[in-house]
Each structure stands twice: as structure tokens, then as C-alpha cells.
């Protein structure tokens, strides 16, 4: 095993000479590069969830298997998504800035900072893989209504409704995007779809 802290696409061909397996993390590996790989390479492993940095068609053409780590940091990403929702609803940043600036009167009286409770609010989740499911679990614990759009139709579960994308966007107070970046999902959220959302 040979490990490099950092490799550019330009350095890759030299560094993989004689390798059977390549493990990479988010480095762009396009088709032109993959087609130049030595015949010894049989597997490219993306050390993360996303693999949009790899040309899958070129790898298939060269007989190279590609894999990823679907559960990589799923809980951490889910926590971050929920943390952002809670931050938006509590305006914590505004409160902390007021406090830091010595604005204790308005801070303690809550005159300038409206609070929004997330319980009872609707969370729209786009993508129901490892991360989407982890977000659902936390949102259920927060007593949120949950709408989910996924490319694979599913039956509703306790507290979770699977619906089309338009329904998610029109009815959600918050939307959390957790689908892979593919040609089908790129620009899924755009000016037109954002216009469907609540003001």
C-alpha cells in the first residue's frame, strides 16, 4: 500500500503504476484519465458518499469497478442539516451578535428576535438514502411533519409521507437536499422550483 497525502489529476498516472486498487477522496478523475490507467487497475474506491467526480462510463468501458462508502459521515451530515434548520428558526446568530454588542436589554426581552418552533413545521427531504433517513429520524424526534421525495416510490411510514417533488416544495417550511449529484439531479433546484416554495 502506498499512501499520498495529496495527488493532483496530473500526478495520478505516475502514482498508480502497478496498482490494483485506487482509493481517492473527491479528486476529479475524468474519462480521458481513466482510459490511460494501467491494465492492473481493477477498482476505484471513492472514500466518501459522492462519486460525481468519477467518470463511471469510462470506468465501465475499461472494466474497472467503482465503489463508494454510502454511510460515510451520514450522521454528521444529518446533524449539520438539522443544526442549520434550528439555527434558522431560533435566529441564534442574531441573538449572539446582540449579546456580544452589549445589547442586553433587547436580548433579554426578546423584542427584536422572533422565535419559530420547529415542532409542527413541515420538513421536506429530497433524497432518502443514508443521510436522508438520518435526517428523518431526527426530524421525527423534533415532532416535525415530514414530506419526502425520492426517485424510488415508497409506502408512507409512521409520520413520513412520500410525495412528488412539487408537493415537497409547495408544502414544506424547510427543505433539506440529500440526493447524489448526477446529471438527473443537477439543477433540480432552480429558479422555477424555488418559486414553488412558500415565501
Feature annotation, model-predicted:
Residues 1-67, 170, 190:
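An N-terminal-biased, well-structured beta-alpha scaffold segment characteristic
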Residues 2-7, 24-27, 101-110, 155-162, ...:
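Short gly/ser/thr-rich secondary-structure transition/capping motifs
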Residues 31-34, 54-56, 78, 135, ...:
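Short glycine-/acidic-enriched loop or helix-start segments at secondary-structure transitions
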Residues 49, 71, 129-132:
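Glycine-rich NAD(P) Rossmann-fold beta1-alpha1 loop
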Residues 62, 70-122, 137:
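Phosphate-binding beta-alpha-beta segment of Rossmann-like dinucleotide-binding domains, i.e.
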Residues 65-71, 162-165:
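Short beta-strand elements at the ligand-binding edges of bilobed clamshell
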Residues 111-199:
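Rossmann-like dinucleotide/phosphate-binding beta-alpha-beta segment
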Amino acid at each position: 500500500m502506498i499512501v499520498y497525502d495529496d495527488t493532483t489529476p496530473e500526478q495520478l498516472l505516475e502514482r498508480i503504476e502497478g496498482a490494483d486498487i485506487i482509493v481517492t477522496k473527491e479528486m476529479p478523475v475524468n474519462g480521458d484519465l481513466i482510459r490511460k490507467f494501467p491494465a492492473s487497475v481493477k477498482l476505484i474506491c471513492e472514500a466518501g458518499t459522492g462519486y460525481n467526480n468519477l467518470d463511471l462510463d469510462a470506468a465501465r468501458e475499461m472494466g474497472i469497478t467503482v465503489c463508494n462508502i454510502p454511510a460515510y459521515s451520514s450522521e454528521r451530515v444529518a446533524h449539520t442539516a438539522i443544526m442549520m434548520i434550528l439555527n434558522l428558526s431560533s435566529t441564534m446568530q442574531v441573538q449572539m451578535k446582540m449579546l456580544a454588542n452589549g445589547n442586553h436589554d433587547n436580548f433579554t426581552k426578546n423584542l427584536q428576535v422572533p422565535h419559530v418552533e420547529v415542532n409542527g413545521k413541515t420538513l421536506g427531504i429530497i433524497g432518502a438514502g443514508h443521510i436522508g433517513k438520518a435526517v428523518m429520524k431526527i426530524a421525527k424526534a423534533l415532532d416535525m411533519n415530514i414530506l419526502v421525495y425520492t426517485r424510488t416510490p415508497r409506502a408512507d411510514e409512521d409520520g413520513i409521507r412520500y410525495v412528488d417533488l412539487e408537493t415537497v416544495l409547495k408544502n414544506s417550511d424547510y427543505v433539506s437536499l440529500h440526493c447524489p449529484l448526477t446529471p438527473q439531479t443537477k439543477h433540480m433546484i432552480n429558479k422555477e422550483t424555488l418559486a414553488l416554495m412558500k415565501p
